[in-house]
């Protein structure tokens, strides 16, 4: 995992997304994302394909999402903003808690994700 641009908190708190996060993800995300580097960008694309959509609006882009479990402990979701500055091999994970504090994570730490494929369309 690595530090991001600090933009996640801004977008997570926008009302255009917040109500949909509560409805579709089942939680109110902590303002910020955990950026997870994935060695193979093709893995990211495979996860992203068929992911459900959270609608943007008012100049904000749509966001695809897939529910996941981080380190076997924290339920959350991987977000795929259609407008992003991240390179392809980076996943943005959100959860209802501050993940760095809750799991005592630092830049460079390795994390695991269990992907919930039940909402992914083929």
UniProtKB/Swiss-Prot annotation:
**What is the UniProt remark on how the cofactor binds and its stoichiometry?**
Binds 1 Mg(2+) ion per subunit.
User: So, what pathway does this thing act in?
Assistant: Cofactor biosynthesis; FMN biosynthesis; FMN from riboflavin (CTP route): step 1/1
The entry marks the following residues as binding CDP, namely: 4-9, 97-100
What Gene Ontology molecular-function terms does this entry list? magnesium ion binding; nucleotide binding; riboflavin kinase activity
- Tell me which cofactor or cofactors this protein depends on: Mg(2+)
EC annotation? 2.7.1.161
Q: Which residues cross the membrane?
A: none
The yes or no answer to whether the keyword Manganese is present is: no
Its domain of life? Archaea
The protein's name is Riboflavin kinase
Q: Which gene encodes it?
A: ribK
């Amino acid at each position: 995992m690595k530090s991001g641009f600090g933009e996640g908190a801004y977008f997570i708190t926008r009302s255009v997304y917040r109500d949909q996060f509560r409805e579709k993800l089942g939680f109110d995300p902590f303002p910020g994302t955990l950026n997870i580097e994935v060695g193979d960008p093709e893995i990211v694309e495979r996860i992203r394909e068929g992911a459900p959509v959270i609608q943007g609006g008012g100049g904000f882009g749509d966001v695809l999402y897939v529910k996941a479990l981080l380190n076997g402990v924290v339920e959350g979701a991987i977000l795929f903003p259609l407008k992003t500055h991240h390179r392809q091999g980076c996943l943005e994970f959100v959860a209802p808690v501050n993940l760095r504090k809750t799991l005592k994570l630092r830049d460079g730490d390795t994390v695991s994700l269990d992907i919930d494929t039940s909402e992914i369309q083929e």
